[in-house]
């Protein structure tokens, strides 16, 4: 089932690139959660670096940024260090959370990209399927709305 605006996100607890647990039930701020296909690929690097470059804007708007793919902790750590990413990359190695969100595949086999704006109560407020561009258009009102 594909999640839509107004839906409650599923409860999850995943490790990030440093081995820290990130859990949906600990949200204290709005969350920009972006699903991407794979570490160290051209499109994913552009996407991740775009969030890196706009990270301060998201913080000003009161939002955390988390990336998520099926890469390992080691892969995520290398990708984050190489590109100086200051936000967590979560490991969804069996695509369980990706499937719970209903993130579609492209061409039937390439993991898709979707960005969700989620409020602190875990409700999806906006969905963008156009890399970072759509998410960056959402700068006012704040992601809390």
Q: What is the meaning of each model-derived region?
A:
Residues 1-11:
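N-proximal helix/coil linker or "cap" segments that precede and/or mark the start of modular domains
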Residues 9-10, 30-32, 106, 112-114:
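Short loop/turn microsegments at loop-to-beta-strand junctions
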Residues 13-30:
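A short beta-strand-turn-helix
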Residues 26-42:
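Short active-site neighborhood of thiol/selenol oxidoreductases, capturing the structured segment around
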Residues 41, 138-145:
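Conserved small/polar residues in nucleotide/adenosyl-binding loops
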Residues 45-83, 96-97:
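Structural microenvironment flanking redox-active thiols in thiol-disulfide oxidoreductases
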Residues 66, 77-112:
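Short, internal strand/loop/helix patches
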Residues 116-141:
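Thiol-/selenol-based redox modules, centered on thioredoxin-like
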